[in-house]
């Protein structure tokens, strides 16, 4: 509020969206949506415009997360879409952040395997490093299931590669 001019100053909720990302990381996990009643708070006296259901639907279909006013809970960010056009789980902020987090954790855990002999011990070390990470994410409501496939062939060993595929099923 601008007390000198006795009027409200309206700021975009972008500042709150960024804060909600950080707060979500600090209070839960990055794969939780930084939106909704629990994690979607907008720090304001009131919204500049109170949306109606038709407004919210139109915004969400256009990949814009609406800001919704609740009588009891205040103003909240009410959506978690990103700008991906295709309709899939990948157009959700929480799923994108889940993938980024898993990728980072696995990369860090597997650094010690680089330049190791390409044998069954290294393959087992990889699985020993990756499975607990994915088990932890599953235990903390990020994924409901996963599968790790290591395609260890003679050709890949000769190229000093350990190709693998990790399949995950994000929690909806």
Model-derived features: positions:
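Structured, hydrophobic secondary-structure cores that serve as assembly/anchoring elements
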Residues: 1-172
């Amino acid at each position: 509020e601008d007390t000198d001019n006795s009027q409200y100053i309206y700021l975009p909720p972008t500042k709150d969206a960024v804060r909600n990302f950080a707060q979500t990381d600090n209070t839960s996990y990055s794969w939780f949506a930084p939106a909704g009643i629990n994690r979607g708070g907008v720090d304001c006296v009131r919204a500049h415009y109170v949306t109606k259901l038709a407004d919210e639907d139109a915004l969400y279909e256009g990949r814009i997360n609406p800001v919704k006013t609740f009588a009891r809970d205040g103003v909240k960010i009410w959506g978690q879409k990103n700008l991906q056009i295709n309709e899939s789980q990948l157009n959700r902020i929480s799923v994108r952040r889940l993938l980024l987090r898993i990728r980072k954790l696995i990369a860090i855990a597997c650094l010690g395997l680089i330049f190791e002999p390409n044998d069954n011990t290294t393959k087992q070390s990889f699985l020993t490093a990756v499975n607990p990470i994915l088990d932890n994410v599953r235990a903390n409501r990020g994924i409901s299931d996963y599968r790790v496939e290591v395609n260890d062939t003679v050709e890949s060993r000769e190229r000093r590669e350990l190709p693998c595929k990790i399949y995950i099923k994000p929690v909806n």
